[in-house]
């Protein structure tokens, strides 16, 4: 059911009803007792699993959540830094220009452009650039690039780029959860 991938890093993969929650909870409780100054990061596949694992546990030293919620809650605080926004533009500027031009005349892009113009007065690269002051998680499969919003897959991809480019993010995670 559980394989130790690295020291103190486990991959738990088993079918429903096999005792995953019980096993993880026991491991967390045991670790917290043995290591009273440490914190635990426990990434789950679903929000429901995170809620179930966290039930009846003192959670000030344990983070239960999906990878998306962890990025949003912990790493998301970095997503308003100028360097991160610059990276966003480096990665997504071409796609943003495509959305603005909408040469393929995609109906959803046309509707989105109209909403953007209503909100900000115009839709051009300078306006979009001046309005994105934080990168955020949309909690959907789709990006909202004109607003700095990333969907499920791009949130993970972009976060990896940010962590690789800015080692301080990795250090903050290590300091808290290693």
Outline where the language-model segments fall:
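Accessory N-terminal region flanking or inserted into the helicase ATPase core
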Residues: 1-13, 23, 104-178
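Residues that form generic nucleotide/phosphate-binding pockets
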Residues: 56, 70-74, 99, 103, ...
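Charge-rich, low-complexity amphipathic helices
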Residues: 50, 75, 92-97, 177
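P-loop NTPase Walker
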Residues: 1-83
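Conserved phosphoryl-transfer catalytic core
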Residues: 82-110
């Amino acid at each position: 059911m559980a394989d130790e991938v690295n020291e103190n890093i486990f991959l738990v993969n088993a079918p429903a009803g096999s005792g995953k929650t019980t096993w993880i909870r026991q491991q967390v409780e045991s670790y917290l007792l043995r290591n009273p100054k440490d914190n635990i990061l426990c990434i789950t596949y679903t929000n429901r699993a995170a809620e179930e694992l966290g039930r009846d546990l003192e959670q000030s030293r344990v983070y239960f959540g999906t990878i998306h919620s962890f990025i949003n809650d912990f790493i998301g605080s970095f997503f308003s830094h100028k360097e991160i926004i610059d990276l966003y533009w480096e990665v997504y500027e071409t796609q943003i220009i495509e959305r603005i031009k909408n040469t393929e005349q995609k109906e959803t892009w046309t509707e989105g452009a109209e909403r953007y113009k209503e909100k900000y007065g115009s839709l051009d690269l300078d306006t979009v650039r001046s309005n994105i002051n934080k990168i955020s998680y949309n909690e959907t499969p789709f990006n909202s690039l004109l607003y700095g919003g990333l969907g499920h897959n791009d949130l993970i991809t972009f976060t990896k780029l940010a962590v690789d480019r800015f080692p301080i993010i990795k250090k903050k995670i290590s300091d808290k959860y290693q």
